[in-house]
Amino acid sequence: MNQTVTENHRLRDTIIIGAGLTGLTTAYYLTRKGCDIEVIEQSPCVGGQIRTYHENGFTFESGPNTGVISHPEVAELLAKLSPTCRLETAREASRQRLIWKGDRFHSLPSGLFSAITTPLFSTKDKFNILGEPFRSKGNNPDETIGELVQRRLGISYLHYAVDPFISGVYAGDPMRLVTRHALPKLYQLEQTYGSFILGGIAKSFSHRSERDRLATRKVFSTYGGLSNLTKALEQAIGIKRFSLGAISTSLMPCEQGWVVSFTDSCGIVNRIHCRKVITTAPAFALPSLLPFVPDKQMNRISNLTYAPVMQVSVGLRNTYGKEFHAFGGLIPSCEQKTVLGILFPSACFDNRSPEGGALYSYFLGGTRHPELLEKSDDEIIRLITTGLNEMLDYPAGIVPDLIRIFRHKKAIPQYESSSTDRFAAINELQKQYPGLVVAGNLKGGIGMADRIKQAVEIARER
């Protein structure tokens, strides 16, 4: 008589929870070292927030559109995955960034002459910036980005350079994000050199190793979209190492290490005994994932604000002769527009739209306007089509050939004033429970490059 299997027990050396970019990259490098690993993922597919769609000749993303090669680990990973996954860097012409002021977009200055003549910044601040190298450096470790920039550069640089940049990266408020956590390189420029300008000059003359030069800071994707990156990682790791569609996942410490429990897509309870666990889950998922951690201790880790973001992919087969040779346009919050920014993927990469067409990615919401995610699809479509006319100068009443709306209610973690205590609490927890690693974008940076770098460092230490 056949018995129905209701529980499945097995042994592993290391369990990785989460098959986003951090989890996949960690699993990839551990697998290359010969470690016996398994990746547990709630979704039925890998990739986390990264998801590429192909529809009617358009290739668009529902999550991150691009990364920046800001760490050598990015170039090294993509070189290892080639030719299964091929690096695609943005066209040189798309290096231009646009900032909205008044009734149109203006180019962000890229040289001395444009910095002097730009209408984005006030005459007062243009003169005041000459004194930036002589200003005292700050002594508040939790100074926000907004406070730092206003102190060193002036209010117009905050409004028309840094604020839109923060909207584009964090969908957040520069007056709430702590510089040393959200923009650590900017913080270190002031702390090390006493000045952004002097620090930038010193950095440009500093010796860089051959490996350091791999960090070109170029904007990148992969040919065919970023899902090709996560699929290549999945293929290299091996599908048998994944448990997808897992629910009710939790872990408990035991004498020999850890027991990871979850219910799989067939309804079978799995219990895996392992030596180490690496979690890449978001902060809000940790209370149920780590039930053995007391509430007071857990609250220090899980009280992380996430910016809600709506991304709208807009495709046009007929561009009416318009060409935007830029990465995209950002809208400062002081301009009081509904849109945070518009990326121009088809200006950056090949085959993102049919020949002669264009693809745009609109971003709305953020920490300042979370209510926009509650608007209906019809309301959003009206807003977008109006914006095509008012902001990109397309004919009034134009109907896009493609509109796809993606709502992410907890999209981007905000490294605010609670971050210092959060990072300390994570370190304390890891020391208290050897073999546990708390990773993911709740610490160490939110960009794709940060995720890859963190994963490489974790795999190196295992």
Each language-model region and where it sits:
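Dinucleotide-binding Rossmann-like beta1-alpha1 core, especially the glycine-rich loop
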Residues: 56-137
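Glycine-rich FAD pyrophosphate-binding loop
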Residues: 31-55
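N-terminal Rossmann-like FAD-binding beta1-loop-alpha1 element of flavoenzymes
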Residues: 12-39
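A short alpha-helix-loop-beta-strand transition element characteristic
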Residues: 52, 75-97, 156-160, 306, ...
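Conserved flavin/dinucleotide-binding core of flavoenzymes
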Residues: 2, 7, 109-113, 324-326, ...
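Conserved Rossmann-like nucleotide-cofactor binding loop
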Residues: 22, 45, 284
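Mid-domain catalytic core of redox enzymes
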Residues: 9, 33, 244-360, 367-374, ...
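Active-site/ligand-binding neighborhood in enzyme catalytic cores
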Residues: 131-251, 257
